[in-house]
Curated annotation (Swiss-Prot):
GO terms for cellular component: nucleus. The keyword Transcription regulation applies. The gene is bzpM. Its main location: nucleus. InterPro entries: bZIP (IPR004827), bZIP_sf (IPR046347). Probable transcriptional regulator. It comes from Dictyostelium discoideum. It comes from the Eukaryota. Residues 221-240 have a biased composition (Low complexity). This is Probable basic-leucine zipper transcription factor M. The lineage of its organism: Eukaryota, Amoebozoa, Evosea, Eumycetozoa, Dictyostelia. Residues 221-250 are annotated as: Disordered. SUPFAM superfamilies: Leucine zipper domain (SSF57959).
Amino acid sequence: MEESNNNNFLFSPDYIWSQLLENNNNNYNNNYNNINNSINENLLNELNSFQNTGVFDLDTNIEQQQQQQPTEIQQQLQNYQEFQQKKYQERQEQYQIQYQQSYIEPLNFNETYNNETYCNIIPQPPQVEQQQEQEQEQEQQQKQQQQQYIEKQIQEIIKIPEKRQTLNQIPIEMMQHNFFNTPKLDQQLLSNYSDFFKTNPILPTTTTTTTTTAITIDQQQQNHIDNQSLNNSNTKTSKNQQKDNNLPKKKNLSYDITKITFNNNNIEKKRDQTESSKNFREKKKEYVKEIESKILALTLENDKLKKENDSLKTINGSNLMRPEPESINMIMECKKIIKKLEKALIDNDERSLIYLLYHYHSETSKRYSLVEIEVDKIANPYSQIKLKLAGYIQNPTTLDIFDGNFNNNNNNNGNKEEEEEISWFIKYKNEANLTIEQSNKLDLLRNQHGLIFETLLKERKQLDNEILKVFNEIIIASYDGSNANLISDKGFELKSKLKSLKMKIISSLNLNLDTFSSISSILLPKQEALLLVRAHLFGSSKLNPQMDFLNNVWTNIISSNSSCSVFEILNSLKEFSDLENLELNKNS
């Protein structure tokens, strides 16, 4: 038997694998035979039923087989349950043998039980109870022993209160128990200590002598210290007397110091005077500082005003209406982009056209932030005085794309400029190959822009005339010194007019920007680029000789050394109005 068991562990893996294959083949053959037998039986039953009835009942046979033959899973479950029940019965029998108690049936978990019922049902073993009782008895015995020991000590102390036990008389066990809670090393030290005192016993007289000797030594030390302190004090007093003798003797006073009296009222007055003088000096310093700070502020304001006056005197008409450097940079960038657009149109490069158009729109959007800065320069009272005295009324700025649309509605008097302004837009439509929808949308946009532009133009002309009247009234009132209230009232009126003018200018500029951005939604990128190129070329060819002439007149007036009055300025600008009248008569 031993040899066979040892050989089982020495099989090769090939042998094990071959045995596994044989087992699988045997199982497969058995299953196959069982299936064939069941199929043959089913076929025989179906043939018999067909001979009797003439119909195959396949479904009924299958259902009967399913009802008769339990499945493999159900069989496994039943076997498992039976096995578990057997195990449970064996455990209960073992439990009954160990604890000699009656057999308990298994609990029905469907029923509900409280904790008390479970405790009553489940029995406790007798061995555990015995152990608990023994532990309790041991604890009680230990407590009783400790109490007895403590009582004995208390009784001994009460019996002998007067006797003082020396170290020799005290037993070592008592010392260990009361004073020391130490290991073996401490016990050795105590034993050595007791042996030493046994060999050299201490008499009670020695203790008294040692105490007396210690007391005498302490007294001697204290006396020595007191003597030293007295000697030091005597030496100090003697030194002080010598110093007093060495000092020069003072002259004897002719009057007694005790008879001198002081007036308290005079002392209080002096104190009040000193305090008042201090307060006055502090206030004076603060006042001087305030005046100095005010003087510095006034000097700074005067210097600033002088610089502004000098700069305004040297400013020409062109410098007055010159835009900000940021807006100039924006215009120059737009011109560069338009040149690049023209080149891209010639090369027929659509990708570069889209990129340049995006860059152009981003540059023109900066105009919104620069509008208020430019408008503040125009709506400034100083610049408005110069413009009104010069007789120049600023027209609202229009886009070059929509310029000429308003003359189309009016009767054309054969002007070449108006014909050019109308013809270039028609040429652009043909060149860009616009559809009918695109051309209609552009025409509607131009008409809307024209209507809003005309309303703004009328409102601004009215405001310019009203501002000019207010300036004339202020100038006339300034010659009469008595009309100070009228000047202040007109000043408030002028402020309100300038604010409204500022709002109108901002709205006109925003109108141009909004209409320009809406063009990109109507046209294609190539068409928009072509429109920008054509409109830019047309707008750059226009000139404004009136503004140039006005700038020249204004520079001549300011360059003269003598201070010019209002009437002299008006006389010098008479030529400008005469030339305008001549041009109007020619056109009519």
